[in-house]
Amino acid sequence: VGYVPVRGDCLEGTVNFVSNEVRELPADGRDRLDALFRSDPLMSRLDAELLSWSPGLATVRAKIQAAHTNFIGGGHGGIVFSLGDIAMSFASNGYGRQALATQIDISYHRGVLPGDLVIATASEISRTRRFGHHRVEMKVNERLVASATGTTYRTDEWHFGAEFWPDDWRGKY
């Protein structure tokens, strides 16, 4: 809660601030991004659900199914990783600027089983003009099963085109 100052882009020498407060997206940006996120093919393939999102924050969930298990019968770590990656992609793209994961480090703390409902929450730690850094937690029944940190590259491209987003929004985010 509150603001965390981060060093700005080296080329611009600016300072950006990351807030945990909900940001109001311009015009119908929220509805269009929501539809875009909900159309994610991998999320659909995993029968995952987007629970909530705002710029810099997102939560998704999925029940571990028999098809999500590894050869010893436990939930496959790749499914848990994918849920975290999906949450991070929505959090980082929630400003409207296209962002791509460049790195994710994950630690598995306990296994998951078929029937477990995994909830993955990604939150922004810091953001500059070019990079976003995120923390991701995957939980079952409020117990941490995996945690990750990741970096995203923030491109110059905007979802729905730059002209869709007001100048002040593009300048700030």
Question: Where do the language-model regions lie?
Answer:
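Terminal targeting signals and extreme-terminal segments of soluble enzymes
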Residues: G2-Y173
